[in-house]
Amino acid sequence: RIDQDDRIALLGQNGEGKSTLAKLISDRLRPMAGRVVRSSKLRIGYFAQHQVDELHIDETPLDHIRRLRPSKTPAQLRAILGGFGIGAEQTETLVGRLSGGQKARLSLLLATLDAPHMLILDEPTNHLDIESREGLVEALTAYSGAVILISHDMHLLSLVADRLWLVKDGKVTPYEEDLETYRKDLLSTEK
């Protein structure tokens, strides 16, 4: 069960199914067996690092958001972009010329534009500089919906997550220890 104010970190080694679970929860992947139960009114925002590669490189950030909000004025669209750290200069820059961090901010903006009840973030700090990571932490802390995080960034997880779930051997179980214990467990299994 996931409640609206949950901040859940999915833990597990590479290949254990964290991203697959995130895709199942967000309805980006159909289950091979069983079912996923969710409210028909539930809106889920999903951000994965590969989405940065799905942006239209021959368009500007303003073009991307204008397509989704055609009734908004250019000033309103620029204000939305500015709220995600995409400044006036970048709004008219082709996405192909933006930095990795700027592309990641645009992708995150697009994932949250419809005010989802839940955000699922799969490796959200890849491509982000330190300032952008701090901004992400602030945004996630202020966000009123549920958050599910997959990240190797233990610092991010320690600042955002209040529940830990371990994905291992095809099962998801609450992880009752803290992140430092998990990190030590990981290091001991790698030896």
What are these language model-derived features?
Residues R1-K191:
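ABC ATP-binding cassette signature C-motif
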